[in-house]
Amino acid sequence: VSADPSDVILARMMSLHPKIIDLTLDRVWRLLAALGHPERALPPVIHIAGTNGKGSTQAMMRAGLEAAGQRVHAYTSPHLVRFHERIRLAGRLIEEDALAALLDEAEAANGPDPITYFEITTCAAFLGFARTPADALLLEVGLGGRLDATNVIDRPALCVITPVSMDHEAYLGPTLGAIAGEKAGILKRGVRAVIGPQEPAAMAVIEARAEAVGAPLFVANRDWQSRRERDRLIYEDDRGLLDLPLPALPGVHQIDNAGAAIAGLRLMGLDAAACEGAVTRPEWPARMQRLTRGPLAQSAPGIELWLDGGHNPGAGVAIAATL
């Protein structure tokens, strides 16, 4: 099977920097300038950081925005099967021709200068987002937040920090507080931020950062709460109560993720119908996904098979609670 043109370009991009991860924004700013600063021409950005639940929260927010009739860009990582999964333009996965053209343009603008794979592909994605009309961009952090390639948006419409857990300590720091400090690096002056449930050590750091930069926080179990009650999702904030179906995404942890998504949608002025769409319409593969078809399921008749991409202690706790 011949490789797609984008696969060939992506393979070349892997060789532009000796490290897969090297956290700094210098190279990103250089390339964005060479590309004409596409990050300044984006639709309203919802910037999402956190250790666990970023993808699920993003998927629910996208479902809610789309239920309200909005055209939504989305940027996520990593991908499961094909790189194209990382970039949605106005609700649709990017097509091969468009992806190859964006990667070509970013590669030509960068030349031989060192840059990591995630940095150059993020810059390419910004080109696509800037050139395609949409009402919102859901922008998921790749790693950390403060020095992540996505953290070049001066004034997002909203920030979201999902639960922080121990992960990638070699890059983000050896303690929960240090990791939370990196995640809180996405907070911006005057930009509201939804904060999912946090351990006290993480919450203290997030609150200190928010106070330092002047970012208003909308915090789980203080300003909003979500809970399961009689097979319904109950969400409450100062605007009132929503009685909604349980999230379509399985897992007890999705109650918290749904709460963060709904909190964000309500801060952006969306109504109850959009919030219901957020919990009933999302799809997010490999997150507590039961395998009922395919060769693996056929090879284990009578056995329940579940697929989940969790890879840190917080995710392990969530999986155990669900099972």
Q: Positions of the model-derived regions?
A:
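Charged, amphipathic alpha-helical linker segments immediately N-terminal to NTP-binding catalytic cores
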Residues: V1-I21
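ATP-dependent carboxylate-amine ligase catalytic core
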Residues: K19-I21, L25-P43, E66-D154, A170-L172, ...
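Nucleotide phosphate-binding/pyrophosphate-handling subdomain across enzymes
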Residues: L42-P44, R131, D135-L139, L147-V160, ...
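A conserved segment at the C-terminal end of the G1
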Residues: I48, S56-H73
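Aromatic/hydrophobic pocket-lining residues that form π-stacking "cages" and hydrophobic walls in ligand
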Residues: M61, A125, I206, A210
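Acidic, Mg2+-coordinating active-site environments of NTP-dependent enzymes
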Residues: D135-V141, P156-P245, A258-E276
